Amino acid sequence: MLDKLAFLQEKYEDLGEKISDPEIINDQVQWQKLIKEHSEIEPIVMKYREYKTTQQALGETKEIMHDKATDAELKEMAKMEVEELEESIVEMEEQLKVMLLPTDPNDDKNVIVEIRGGAGGDEAGLFAAVLFRMYTRYAERSGWKVEMMSLNESGVGGYKEVIFMIKGKGAYSQLKYESGAHRVQRIPTTESGGRIHTSTATVVIMPEAEDVGEVNIDTNELRIDVFRSSGNGGQSVNTTDSAVRITHLPTGLVVSCQDGKSQLKNKEKAMKVLKSRLLDQMIQEQDAEISQDRRSKVGTGDRSERIRTYNFPQGRVTDHRINVTVYKLDAFLDGEINEMIDSLITSAQAEKMQEVQ
């Protein structure tokens, strides 16, 4: 680990010199690339420098503690300081191990979220709407923007399907473990006998595909159909062919968008979703190549995997992958999901650390 940290510090200093070079500054593409690389390794280098400074302080304090000329009171103070410094060093070593873990290249990206009502009829659609509100409230609390892509309502205040984008640095790193089947247990308002019903909704989290180079789509492989929107956007929505359906012929992926009144905007949104689905498909294929014994319990992103249960009578939320339960259901559904997300990230990091050891 120390060799790798020393190498990164040397690289950081070398990059610092390069980004100050007038010739490189004139090449904005190269300069931006170096700036990005420099900023990515800066936190690790700063932590490594702090670690080395603490190591040096520990050595000096130990010398004072073992010096025969040091009086008893000062030795006692030095002993206490040694204990504190040793604790700090152990903590920093763990932090550095985590910082050196391989990073997901998609972590900083915006995300496209797809939520669909599953088993349970109208209740499933209502639960899909609850999850939509939960994620949009979480986005607001994080200072991120939400952009609606497509909405298909169920007619009872629920959603058959809702697709939206969350724009914010690091959105994918925080939300990528939300993909899977979410289960709800509650008493429907229409249930006179007070029986608890179980229904599900599926969530898919995809990183937004970059416009340049990341996902190449041949326009000859697309079939684009336009049709009249069936949404609740007023009469003007239904009098023009503003809705768009794009079919990617090689994969059979189909994306529809009818949320806006502009056919052009609907087409742009549908293309964004299609690109992100294709990128997500590539990620899923890469994950499938990982041998079963090394596959992360948290990060499989299996779309059919039941990952979480929301139990209304007991006021609890349980994540089945990490066996964590929180008893703050109302707050959780209002977007206060950081505690669960942090636990999932910590668990995923622990699994990665076991793999690299």
From Swiss-Prot:
Q: Where in the cell is it found?
A: Cytoplasm
What are the alphabetically sorted keywords of the record? Cytoplasm, Methylation, Protein biosynthesis
Q: Which SUPFAM superfamilies match?
A: Release factor
Q: Which GO terms describe its cellular component?
A: cytoplasm
Q: Which cysteines are joined by disulfide bonds?
A: none
PTM comment text = Methylated by PrmC. Methylation increases the termination efficiency of RF1.
**Could you tell me which SMART domains the record lists for this protein?**
PCRF
Q: Which domain of life is it from?
A: Bacteria
Give the modified residues of type N5-methylglutamine.
Answer: Q235
Presence of the UniProt keyword Cytoplasm in the record: yes
A single GO molecular-function term is: translation release factor activity, codon specific
Q: Which Gene3D superfamilies match?
A: 3.30.160.20, 3.30.70.1660, 6.10.140.1950
Question: Which is one Pfam family of this protein?
Answer: PCRF
UniProt record similarity statement: Belongs to the prokaryotic/mitochondrial release factor family.
So what does this one do? Peptide chain release factor 1 directs the termination of translation in response to the peptide chain termination codons UAG and UAA.
Q: Mind telling me what this protein is named?
A: Peptide chain release factor 1
Which lineage ranks, top first, belong to the organism behind this chain? Bacteria, Bacillati, Bacillota, Clostridia, Peptostreptococcales
Q: Which gene encodes it?
A: prfA
